[in-house]
Amino acid sequence: MASSLKKLISSFLLVLYSTTIIVASSESRCRRFKSIISFGDSIADTGNYLHLSDVNHLPQSAFLPYGESFFHPPSGRASNGRLIIDFIAEFLGLPYVPPYFGSQNVSFEQGINFAVYGATALDRAFLLGKGIESDFTNVSLSVQLDTFKQILPNLCASSTRDCKEMLGDSLILMGEIGGNDYNYPFFEGKSINEIKELVPLIVKAISSAIVDLIDLGGKTFLVPGGFPTGCSAAYLTLFQTVAEKDQDPLTGCYPLLNEFGEHHNEQLKTELKRLQKFYPHVNIIYADYHNSLYRFYQEPAKYGFKNKPLAACCGVGGKYNFTIGKECGYEGVNYCQNPSEYVNWDGYHLTEAAYQKMTEGILNGPYATPAFDWSCLGSGTVDT
Protein backbone atom coordinates (compact mmCIF):
# COMPACT_ATOMS: atom_id res chain seq x y z
CA MET A 1 0.00 0.00 0.00
CA ALA A 2 2.77 2.38 0.99
CA SER A 3 4.65 1.50 -2.19
CA SER A 4 1.56 2.20 -4.31
CA LEU A 5 1.04 5.51 -2.54
CA LYS A 6 4.64 6.54 -3.20
CA LYS A 7 4.26 5.70 -6.88
CA LEU A 8 1.04 7.72 -7.04
CA ILE A 9 2.66 10.75 -5.39
CA SER A 10 5.72 10.46 -7.65
CA SER A 11 3.52 10.31 -10.72
CA PHE A 12 1.54 13.34 -9.54
CA LEU A 13 4.70 15.35 -8.91
CA LEU A 14 6.07 14.40 -12.33
CA VAL A 15 2.88 15.58 -14.02
CA LEU A 16 2.89 18.78 -11.95
CA TYR A 17 6.54 19.44 -12.84
CA SER A 18 5.91 18.78 -16.52
CA THR A 19 2.92 21.12 -16.50
CA THR A 20 5.02 23.83 -14.88
CA ILE A 21 7.63 23.45 -17.61
CA ILE A 22 4.99 23.77 -20.34
CA VAL A 23 3.54 26.92 -18.78
CA ALA A 24 6.97 28.44 -18.30
CA SER A 25 7.83 27.83 -21.94
CA SER A 26 4.61 29.30 -23.31
CA GLU A 27 4.29 32.44 -21.19
CA SER A 28 6.51 35.48 -20.96
CA ARG A 29 7.62 36.33 -17.42
CA CYS A 30 7.77 39.96 -16.36
CA ARG A 31 11.27 41.36 -15.90
CA ARG A 32 12.65 44.77 -15.13
CA PHE A 33 15.33 44.86 -17.78
CA LYS A 34 18.45 46.77 -16.85
CA SER A 35 19.95 46.85 -20.33
CA ILE A 36 19.44 45.99 -24.00
CA ILE A 37 21.93 43.93 -26.01
CA SER A 38 21.35 44.13 -29.75
CA PHE A 39 22.53 42.24 -32.81
CA GLY A 40 21.34 42.61 -36.39
CA ASP A 41 21.38 44.79 -39.48
CA SER A 42 20.18 48.27 -40.52
CA ILE A 43 16.77 47.75 -38.92
CA ALA A 44 18.51 47.99 -35.52
CA ASP A 45 21.80 49.79 -36.37
CA THR A 46 22.12 52.91 -34.22
CA GLY A 47 25.40 54.05 -35.77
CA ASN A 48 27.81 51.14 -36.15
CA TYR A 49 28.01 51.21 -39.94
CA LEU A 50 28.59 54.97 -39.88
CA HIS A 51 31.55 54.56 -37.52
CA LEU A 52 32.97 51.61 -39.48
CA SER A 53 32.86 53.53 -42.77
CA ASP A 54 35.75 55.36 -44.42
CA VAL A 55 35.43 59.08 -43.67
CA ASN A 56 35.78 59.74 -47.40
CA HIS A 57 32.99 57.30 -48.27
CA LEU A 58 30.32 57.79 -45.66
CA PRO A 59 26.93 56.11 -46.11
CA GLN A 60 23.82 58.07 -47.07
CA SER A 61 22.56 57.66 -43.49
CA ALA A 62 25.33 60.04 -42.41
CA PHE A 63 23.59 62.93 -44.13
CA LEU A 64 20.25 64.68 -44.07
CA PRO A 65 17.41 63.97 -44.55
CA TYR A 66 18.28 60.86 -42.51
CA GLY A 67 17.49 61.65 -38.90
CA GLU A 68 15.74 64.91 -39.78
CA SER A 69 12.67 64.15 -37.65
CA PHE A 70 14.53 63.40 -34.42
CA PHE A 71 18.32 63.10 -34.40
CA HIS A 72 20.42 66.15 -35.21
CA PRO A 73 22.87 65.64 -36.81
CA PRO A 74 22.09 62.27 -38.44
CA SER A 75 23.13 59.36 -36.21
CA GLY A 76 23.58 56.68 -38.87
CA ARG A 77 20.10 55.26 -38.38
CA ALA A 78 18.43 54.20 -41.64
CA SER A 79 15.28 56.26 -41.14
CA ASN A 80 14.09 59.82 -40.68
CA GLY A 81 14.11 59.25 -36.92
CA ARG A 82 13.91 56.56 -34.28
CA LEU A 83 13.95 52.80 -34.85
CA ILE A 84 12.14 49.95 -33.09
CA ILE A 85 15.10 49.50 -30.74
CA ASP A 86 14.83 53.17 -29.73
CA PHE A 87 11.13 52.90 -28.89
CA ILE A 88 11.80 49.74 -26.87
CA ALA A 89 14.49 51.60 -24.91
CA GLU A 90 12.10 54.49 -24.25
CA PHE A 91 9.42 52.12 -23.00
CA LEU A 92 11.85 50.38 -20.65
CA GLY A 93 13.13 53.71 -19.33
CA LEU A 94 16.61 53.03 -20.68
CA PRO A 95 18.88 55.33 -22.71
CA TYR A 96 19.11 54.85 -26.46
CA VAL A 97 21.36 51.88 -27.11
CA PRO A 98 24.81 53.12 -28.18
CA PRO A 99 26.66 51.49 -31.07
CA TYR A 100 29.71 49.50 -30.00
CA PHE A 101 31.89 50.23 -33.00
CA GLY A 102 33.54 53.63 -32.92
CA SER A 103 32.12 54.71 -29.58
CA GLN A 104 34.48 56.48 -27.20
CA ASN A 105 33.95 57.34 -23.55
CA VAL A 106 30.51 55.72 -23.69
CA SER A 107 29.00 53.59 -20.94
CA PHE A 108 27.59 50.28 -22.12
CA GLU A 109 26.16 49.32 -18.73
CA GLN A 110 22.56 49.93 -19.86
CA GLY A 111 22.92 48.76 -23.42
CA ILE A 112 25.22 47.89 -26.28
CA ASN A 113 24.48 47.47 -29.97
CA PHE A 114 26.41 45.39 -32.51
CA ALA A 115 23.88 45.62 -35.36
CA VAL A 116 25.44 46.81 -38.63
CA TYR A 117 23.80 48.13 -41.78
CA GLY A 118 24.00 45.46 -44.49
CA ALA A 119 24.93 42.65 -42.08
CA THR A 120 24.00 39.05 -42.84
CA ALA A 121 23.16 36.03 -40.72
CA LEU A 122 25.55 33.91 -42.78
CA ASP A 123 29.25 34.69 -43.04
CA ARG A 124 30.46 36.66 -46.03
CA ALA A 125 32.86 33.91 -47.13
CA PHE A 126 30.03 31.38 -47.19
CA LEU A 127 27.83 33.66 -49.29
CA LEU A 128 30.70 34.32 -51.69
CA GLY A 129 31.09 30.57 -52.06
CA LYS A 130 27.46 30.53 -53.20
CA GLY A 131 28.18 33.27 -55.71
CA ILE A 132 26.47 35.94 -53.60
CA GLU A 133 28.21 39.29 -53.20
CA SER A 134 27.73 41.14 -49.89
CA ASP A 135 29.80 44.27 -50.28
CA PHE A 136 28.34 46.44 -47.53
CA THR A 137 30.07 44.85 -44.54
CA ASN A 138 31.73 41.66 -43.34
CA VAL A 139 30.30 42.10 -39.84
CA SER A 140 27.96 39.11 -40.00
CA LEU A 141 26.01 37.77 -37.03
CA SER A 142 28.86 35.46 -36.02
CA VAL A 143 31.34 38.36 -36.14
CA GLN A 144 29.02 40.47 -33.99
CA LEU A 145 28.67 37.63 -31.50
CA ASP A 146 32.42 36.95 -31.40
CA THR A 147 33.06 40.64 -30.77
CA PHE A 148 30.58 40.58 -27.90
CA LYS A 149 32.26 37.52 -26.37
CA GLN A 150 35.67 39.19 -26.61
CA ILE A 151 34.61 42.33 -24.77
CA LEU A 152 32.23 40.64 -22.32
CA PRO A 153 34.83 40.40 -19.50
CA ASN A 154 35.39 44.15 -19.75
CA LEU A 155 31.65 44.82 -19.74
CA CYS A 156 31.23 42.74 -16.60
CA ALA A 157 34.26 44.32 -14.92
CA SER A 158 32.69 47.78 -15.29
CA SER A 159 29.41 46.55 -13.79
CA THR A 160 28.38 45.66 -10.26
CA ARG A 161 26.86 42.44 -11.67
CA ASP A 162 28.68 39.33 -12.84
CA CYS A 163 28.44 38.29 -16.49
CA LYS A 164 25.59 35.81 -16.18
CA GLU A 165 23.60 38.22 -14.03
CA MET A 166 24.19 41.05 -16.50
CA LEU A 167 22.93 38.97 -19.44
CA GLY A 168 20.04 37.65 -17.40
CA ASP A 169 18.90 41.20 -16.66
CA SER A 170 19.10 42.21 -20.34
CA LEU A 171 16.58 42.13 -23.15
CA ILE A 172 18.54 40.57 -26.01
CA LEU A 173 17.32 41.77 -29.41
CA MET A 174 18.25 39.30 -32.15
CA GLY A 175 17.83 41.42 -35.24
CA GLU A 176 16.11 41.67 -37.51
CA ILE A 177 18.84 39.57 -39.17
CA GLY A 178 18.73 37.44 -42.30
CA GLY A 179 16.97 39.89 -44.58
CA ASN A 180 20.18 40.88 -46.34
CA ASP A 181 21.06 37.23 -46.97
CA TYR A 182 18.01 37.31 -49.25
CA ASN A 183 18.32 40.90 -50.48
CA TYR A 184 21.73 40.42 -52.06
CA PRO A 185 20.85 37.37 -54.20
CA PHE A 186 17.44 38.79 -55.16
CA PHE A 187 19.04 41.99 -56.45
CA GLU A 188 21.73 39.93 -58.19
CA GLY A 189 19.02 38.11 -60.14
CA LYS A 190 19.14 34.73 -58.41
CA SER A 191 16.00 32.60 -58.68
CA ILE A 192 13.61 32.29 -55.76
CA ASN A 193 14.27 28.53 -55.62
CA GLU A 194 18.02 29.14 -55.29
CA ILE A 195 17.46 31.65 -52.54
CA LYS A 196 15.01 29.41 -50.69
CA GLU A 197 17.88 26.95 -50.11
CA LEU A 198 19.39 29.54 -47.75
CA VAL A 199 16.39 29.60 -45.39
CA PRO A 200 17.31 26.63 -43.13
CA LEU A 201 20.93 27.82 -43.00
CA ILE A 202 19.91 31.32 -41.92
CA VAL A 203 17.51 29.97 -39.30
CA LYS A 204 20.26 27.71 -37.97
CA ALA A 205 22.67 30.66 -37.72
CA ILE A 206 20.14 32.64 -35.68
CA SER A 207 19.38 29.63 -33.48
CA SER A 208 23.08 28.92 -32.85
CA ALA A 209 23.66 32.52 -31.79
CA ILE A 210 20.75 32.31 -29.33
CA VAL A 211 22.14 29.09 -27.83
CA ASP A 212 25.57 30.70 -27.38
CA LEU A 213 23.97 33.64 -25.58
CA ILE A 214 21.89 31.32 -23.39
CA ASP A 215 25.11 29.55 -22.37
CA LEU A 216 26.54 32.95 -21.41
CA GLY A 217 23.52 33.70 -19.20
CA GLY A 218 20.91 35.25 -21.51
CA LYS A 219 17.33 34.72 -20.34
CA THR A 220 15.07 36.91 -22.50
CA PHE A 221 15.29 37.07 -26.27
CA LEU A 222 13.20 39.09 -28.71
CA VAL A 223 13.64 37.44 -32.10
CA PRO A 224 12.07 39.27 -35.05
CA GLY A 225 10.87 37.66 -38.23
CA GLY A 226 11.32 39.29 -41.62
CA PHE A 227 9.38 42.09 -43.27
CA PRO A 228 6.81 41.70 -46.08
CA THR A 229 9.34 42.56 -48.79
CA GLY A 230 6.65 42.25 -51.43
CA CYS A 231 5.45 45.65 -50.19
CA SER A 232 8.89 47.30 -50.32
CA ALA A 233 9.35 50.11 -52.85
CA ALA A 234 12.76 48.68 -53.76
CA TYR A 235 11.41 45.20 -54.47
CA LEU A 236 8.28 46.47 -56.22
CA THR A 237 10.55 48.50 -58.51
CA LEU A 238 12.89 45.57 -59.12
CA PHE A 239 10.01 43.20 -59.94
CA GLN A 240 7.65 45.83 -61.36
CA THR A 241 6.89 44.02 -64.62
CA VAL A 242 5.77 40.78 -62.97
CA ALA A 243 4.51 42.35 -59.73
CA GLU A 244 1.92 44.48 -61.52
CA LYS A 245 0.52 41.39 -63.23
CA ASP A 246 0.17 39.50 -59.96
CA GLN A 247 -0.28 42.21 -57.36
CA ASP A 248 -2.59 41.94 -54.38
CA PRO A 249 -5.73 43.92 -55.33
CA LEU A 250 -6.10 45.32 -51.79
CA THR A 251 -2.54 46.36 -51.00
CA GLY A 252 -0.70 46.46 -54.33
CA CYS A 253 2.01 44.24 -52.82
CA TYR A 254 3.65 41.34 -54.66
CA PRO A 255 2.32 38.12 -53.02
CA LEU A 256 5.11 35.83 -54.24
CA LEU A 257 7.75 37.74 -52.27
CA ASN A 258 5.55 37.97 -49.19
CA GLU A 259 4.96 34.22 -49.34
CA PHE A 260 8.72 33.71 -49.49
CA GLY A 261 9.13 35.92 -46.42
CA GLU A 262 6.46 33.98 -44.56
CA HIS A 263 8.26 30.74 -45.43
CA HIS A 264 11.33 32.09 -43.64
CA ASN A 265 9.20 33.24 -40.70
CA GLU A 266 7.47 29.87 -40.31
CA GLN A 267 10.83 28.07 -40.31
CA LEU A 268 12.14 30.52 -37.72
CA LYS A 269 9.08 30.12 -35.47
CA THR A 270 9.38 26.33 -35.62
CA GLU A 271 13.01 26.54 -34.54
CA LEU A 272 12.24 28.98 -31.73
CA LYS A 273 9.57 26.62 -30.39
CA ARG A 274 12.14 23.81 -30.41
CA LEU A 275 14.62 25.97 -28.51
CA GLN A 276 11.98 27.04 -26.00
CA LYS A 277 11.16 23.42 -25.15
CA PHE A 278 14.85 22.65 -24.74
CA TYR A 279 15.47 25.74 -22.57
CA PRO A 280 12.26 26.13 -20.48
CA HIS A 281 13.96 28.56 -18.07
CA VAL A 282 14.47 31.07 -20.89
CA ASN A 283 11.96 33.43 -22.54
CA ILE A 284 12.21 33.31 -26.34
CA ILE A 285 9.73 35.78 -27.82
CA TYR A 286 8.98 35.90 -31.54
CA ALA A 287 8.33 39.40 -32.90
CA ASP A 288 6.01 39.26 -35.90
CA TYR A 289 7.46 42.12 -37.94
CA HIS A 290 5.65 40.84 -41.05
CA ASN A 291 2.07 41.23 -39.83
CA SER A 292 2.79 44.17 -37.56
CA LEU A 293 3.82 46.04 -40.72
CA TYR A 294 1.49 44.45 -43.27
CA ARG A 295 -1.62 45.88 -41.59
CA PHE A 296 -0.45 49.38 -42.60
CA TYR A 297 -0.68 48.38 -46.25
CA GLN A 298 -4.10 46.82 -45.72
CA GLU A 299 -5.65 49.79 -43.91
CA PRO A 300 -3.26 52.75 -44.19
CA ALA A 301 -5.76 55.46 -43.19
CA LYS A 302 -6.65 53.60 -39.99
CA TYR A 303 -3.06 53.97 -38.80
CA GLY A 304 -2.57 57.55 -39.95
CA PHE A 305 -0.78 56.86 -43.23
CA LYS A 306 -2.67 59.13 -45.59
CA ASN A 307 -0.35 58.91 -48.57
CA LYS A 308 0.30 55.95 -50.81
CA PRO A 309 1.77 53.43 -48.35
CA LEU A 310 3.97 51.73 -50.96
CA ALA A 311 5.80 54.85 -52.16
CA ALA A 312 9.04 56.02 -50.54
CA CYS A 313 9.01 59.36 -48.73
CA CYS A 314 12.62 60.01 -49.71
CA GLY A 315 13.44 59.10 -53.30
CA VAL A 316 12.89 60.00 -56.91
CA GLY A 317 11.26 58.57 -60.01
CA GLY A 318 8.89 55.81 -60.97
CA LYS A 319 5.64 54.57 -59.54
CA TYR A 320 7.10 54.10 -56.07
CA ASN A 321 9.31 57.21 -55.89
CA PHE A 322 12.36 54.96 -55.99
CA THR A 323 15.21 54.52 -58.46
CA ILE A 324 18.00 51.99 -57.93
CA GLY A 325 21.30 53.86 -57.90
CA LYS A 326 19.67 57.18 -57.05
CA GLU A 327 18.41 56.57 -53.57
CA CYS A 328 17.72 58.79 -50.59
CA GLY A 329 20.75 60.84 -49.56
CA TYR A 330 22.10 61.33 -53.06
CA GLU A 331 22.28 64.79 -54.59
CA GLY A 332 19.05 65.80 -56.29
CA VAL A 333 16.90 63.32 -54.36
CA ASN A 334 14.10 65.00 -52.45
CA TYR A 335 12.07 63.88 -49.47
CA CYS A 336 8.48 64.44 -48.43
CA GLN A 337 7.54 67.15 -45.96
CA ASN A 338 5.18 64.90 -44.01
CA PRO A 339 7.08 61.64 -43.31
CA SER A 340 4.72 60.75 -40.45
CA GLU A 341 2.08 60.05 -43.11
CA TYR A 342 4.34 57.59 -44.95
CA VAL A 343 5.17 53.97 -44.18
CA ASN A 344 8.23 53.73 -46.41
CA TRP A 345 11.19 56.02 -45.86
CA ASP A 346 13.83 55.34 -48.51
CA GLY A 347 12.61 52.31 -50.46
CA TYR A 348 14.30 49.80 -48.16
CA HIS A 349 13.57 51.09 -44.66
CA LEU A 350 10.59 52.55 -42.83
CA THR A 351 9.69 55.90 -41.33
CA GLU A 352 9.86 56.64 -37.63
CA ALA A 353 6.04 56.67 -37.55
CA ALA A 354 5.86 53.14 -38.96
CA TYR A 355 8.50 51.86 -36.54
CA GLN A 356 6.67 53.44 -33.60
CA LYS A 357 3.36 51.79 -34.47
CA MET A 358 5.11 48.47 -35.09
CA THR A 359 6.72 48.68 -31.64
CA GLU A 360 3.34 49.31 -30.02
CA GLY A 361 1.98 46.19 -31.69
CA ILE A 362 4.93 44.12 -30.51
CA LEU A 363 5.18 45.32 -26.91
CA ASN A 364 1.43 45.47 -26.27
CA GLY A 365 0.36 42.71 -28.65
CA PRO A 366 -0.79 40.97 -30.66
CA TYR A 367 2.48 40.76 -32.58
CA ALA A 368 4.68 39.02 -30.00
CA THR A 369 4.50 35.30 -29.20
CA PRO A 370 4.30 34.75 -26.30
CA ALA A 371 3.03 38.20 -25.35
CA PHE A 372 5.18 40.33 -23.06
CA ASP A 373 4.15 40.54 -19.42
CA TRP A 374 4.70 44.12 -18.21
CA SER A 375 2.74 43.79 -14.95
CA CYS A 376 5.83 44.35 -12.80
CA LEU A 377 6.48 47.72 -14.48
CA GLY A 378 3.24 49.25 -13.24
CA SER A 379 2.24 50.13 -16.80
CA GLY A 380 0.49 47.98 -19.35
CA THR A 381 0.86 50.14 -22.43
CA VAL A 382 3.59 51.52 -24.62
CA ASP A 383 3.86 55.27 -24.13
CA THR A 384 6.20 56.65 -26.76
Swiss-Prot record:
One of its GO terms (biological process) is lipid catabolic process. Keywords: Glycoprotein, Hydrolase, Lipid degradation, Lipid metabolism, Secreted, Signal. InterPro entries: GDSL (IPR001087), SGNH_hydro_sf (IPR036514), SGNH_plant_lipase-like (IPR035669). It is found in: Secreted. GO terms for molecular function: hydrolase activity, acting on ester bonds. The active site is at S42 (nucleophile), D346, H349. Pfam families: Lipase_GDSL. Glycans are attached at N105, N138, N321. Its EC number is 3.1.1.-. It is an enzyme of class 3 (hydrolase). Residues 1-24 form the signal peptide. Belongs to the 'GDSL' lipolytic enzyme family. This is GDSL esterase/lipase At1g28670. It comes from Arabidopsis thaliana. The lineage of its organism: Eukaryota, Viridiplantae, Streptophyta, Embryophyta, Tracheophyta.
